[in-house]
Regions:
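A short, solvent-exposed loop/turn motif at the edges and junctions
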Residues: 145-146, 184, 206-224
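Catalytic-core segments of thiol-dependent peptidases
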Residues: 1-44, 51-54
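Short, acidic Ser/Thr/Gly-rich low-complexity loop/linker segments typical of extracellular
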Residues: 185-198
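Short, ordered, surface-exposed loop/turn motifs in non-cytosolic proteins
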Residues: 159-160, 169-183
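Short, glycine-/Ser/Thr-/acidic-enriched flexible segments
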Residues: 2-5, 33-36, 70-73, 144, ...
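Short, solvent-exposed loop/linker segments at the N-terminal edge
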Residues: 153-158
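Short, hydrophobic beta-strand segments
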Residues: 198-206
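Active-site-proximal C-terminal subdomain of hydrolase catalytic domains
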Residues: 31-32, 36-143
């Protein structure tokens, strides 16, 4: 491969426009030479084309891209990064892109311990692998679950609000991030407790309405 894309199987920058994946926007993981070389004369490189693909109303491409920015990577090292990264995600619950990629790179410490000198594999691959996109993005490893959000009537006297967060099966969801927003401003934020409950007090003197959002790994964002 190179900055223009993959050669076997063939998938190049010009092919991105033919994608029709719509809202199913994945993370592209490309353990192929130079496919993430965002400073290359090929502009856009494959990674940039994937991230830029589509429009807000007709999306295509992906939400993030992981790959090397150097042309001279080797399969034996790329495969270690690949294997350790997927092991971290599938077997150890490390689903954020940044930590998962770092886990992949750390595999070279174990598999190639002698490659520790300046410019050798451990240093080289720690520099050339990078993420285009949000490194805190969490990857779905299975069909994501969905929230149900139950809200008790808010008390006008003290702004007391109690929210119950469950999943589709009715199970309580602990440690979900709950954000309450009014006119794009966050007016309260916190985590559900072990019983999936979030309790807060709001200053509702100047609030006509508000939105509640819930987020957690392996869930589609909830909104009410």
């Amino acid at each position: 491969g190179d900055a223009n894309g993959w050669h076997y199987p063939e998938f190049h920058v010009d092919d991105v426009n033919d994608l029709n994946n719509g809202w199913l926007t994945p993370v592209f993981m490309s353990y192929v030479c130079n496919s993430n070389d965002f400073a290359n004369n090929v502009d856009p490189c494959l990674a940039e084309a994937i991230i830029r693909g589509g429009t807000p109303t007709v999306p295509k491409g992906g939400v993030a891209f992981i790959g090397p920015s150097d042309l001279h990577t080797s399969t034996k090292y790329n495969n270690v990064i690949n294997a350790y990264m997927y092991d971290a995600m599938l077997n150890h619950g490390i689903v954020e892109l940044g930590p998962a990629m770092q886990a992949g790179q750390s595999g070279l410490l174990k598999e190639f311990p002698a490659q520790s000198g300046p410019g050798e594999a451990q240093e080289f691959y720690s520099h050339v692998y990078n993420i285009l996109g949000d490194p805190s993005l969490q990857v779905y490893l299975d069909t994501p679950n969905e929230f149900t959000i139950d809200v008790q009537n808010i008390s006008k006297s003290d702004g007391f609000l109690e929210i119950q967060i469950n999943d589709q099966q009715g199970n309580m969801v602990p440690y979900a991030v709950v954000s309450i927003m009014s006119n794009s401003d966050i007016i309260s934020k916190g985590l559900t407790d072990e019983q999936g409950k979030f309790v807060t007090s709001l200053d509702i003197s100047s609030v006509e309405n508000f939105d509640i959002y819930a987020n957690k790994s392996a869930f589609i964002q909830g909104h009410k």
